[in-house]
UniProtKB/Swiss-Prot annotation:
Protein name per the record: 5'-nucleotidase SurE
Taxonomic path: Bacteria, Pseudomonadati, Myxococcota, Myxococcia, Myxococcales
Task of the protein: Nucleotidase that shows phosphatase activity on nucleoside 5'-monophosphates.
Keyword terms of this UniProt record: Cytoplasm, Hydrolase, Metal-binding, Nucleotide-binding
DNA damage as UniProt keyword: no
Native source organism of the sequence: Anaeromyxobacter sp. (strain Fw109-5)
Localization (cell): Cytoplasm
Residues involved in a divalent metal cation binding: D8, D9, S38, N91
Entry similarity comment: Belongs to the SurE nucleotidase family.
Cellular component terms (Gene Ontology): cytoplasm
Required co-factors: a divalent metal cation
Length: 254
């Protein structure tokens, strides 16, 4: 099995190393950001050149975002030798609920799916200290299942693994997490103001049965959540079709 690994914690992150070690015996390629890129979402570098550094055989760093790294991996490093699966992670912390909108880990996997390759985003959903062995083993087992099944369309799975031995898993939907809206204002030694967004403390998780948040944080199970590349809101679309905008002609729905 040919595997492309990436992440958003950077090419030297221990979660990435644990994932590469767990795929021992497979053809593993690593193309990852050269530094920490957490919460970079799906940013891509279109207005500056990228640099690619070969750190070791089949192990590359890109001075860009997680999306840049996977794009470079599929369209340059592995051009003509398409991988069977892209795996992003292991993230140092959870990517649950609306975290996926901000996550560079999820974005790296999503870029793989957008480019036609089955992809997994894998996160260790706990605070430090991080021990990645169980999450890495589960990721490998799930990746093998995906490759063996070969779904007809590129599959994108968001995986969150709790701390400790894996005692079970569940296929889930996304939950909802609420973060603080505080903006903390401070002053640097030169008298200039600077700001931290989000404030202090962790998120509040809504109690939604069947959600990834409940599964991981409430029950201690691995959550595997399929994500969809089409962000259209079909239920709202049906309602909008009855609207009229004054002064403009509405064309028939297709």
């Amino acid at each position: 099995m040919r595997v492309l690994l990436s992440n958003d914690d950077g090419v030297h992150a221990p979660g990435l190393k644990a994932l590469a070690d767990a795929f021992e015996g497979d053809e593993v390629w690593v193309v990852a950001p050269d530094r920490e890129q957490s919460a970079s979402s799906h940013a891509i570098s279109l207005h500056r050149p990228l640099r690619l550094f070969e750190m070791a055989p089949r192990w590359y760093a890109v001075d860009g975002t997680p999306t840049d790294a996977v794009y470079m991996g599929l369209n340059h490093v592995l051009r003509g030798a398409r991988p069977d699966v892209v795996v992003s992670g292991i993230n140092h912390g959870p990517n649950l609920g609306n975290d996926v909108l901000y996550s560079g880990t999820v974005a790296a996997a999503m870029e793989g799916a957008l480019l036609g390759v089955h992809a997994l985003a894998v996160s260790l959903a706990c605070s430090p200290p991080h021990v990645f062995d169980e999450a890495a083993r589960f990721a490998v087992a799930l990746a093998r299942r995906v490759v063996a099944t070969q779904p007809p369309a590129p599959l994108l799975l968001n995986v969150n693994v709790p701390r400790g031995p894996v005692r079970g898993y569940r296929f889930t939907r996304l939950g909802r997490r609420t973060y603080g809206n505080e903006v903390v204002e401070k002053t640097d030694p030169r008298g200039r103001k600077y700001y931290w967004i989000g404030g202090e403390g962790g998120p509040t998780n809504e109690d939604i049965p069947g959600s990834d948040c409940n599964c991981v944080l409430g029950e201690g199970l691995v959550a595997v959540t399929p994500l969809h590349l089409d962000s259209s809101h079909d239920a709202v679309l049906q309602g909008l079709r009855s609207w009229t905008v004054p002064g403009y002609e509405k064309e028939p729905a297709l």
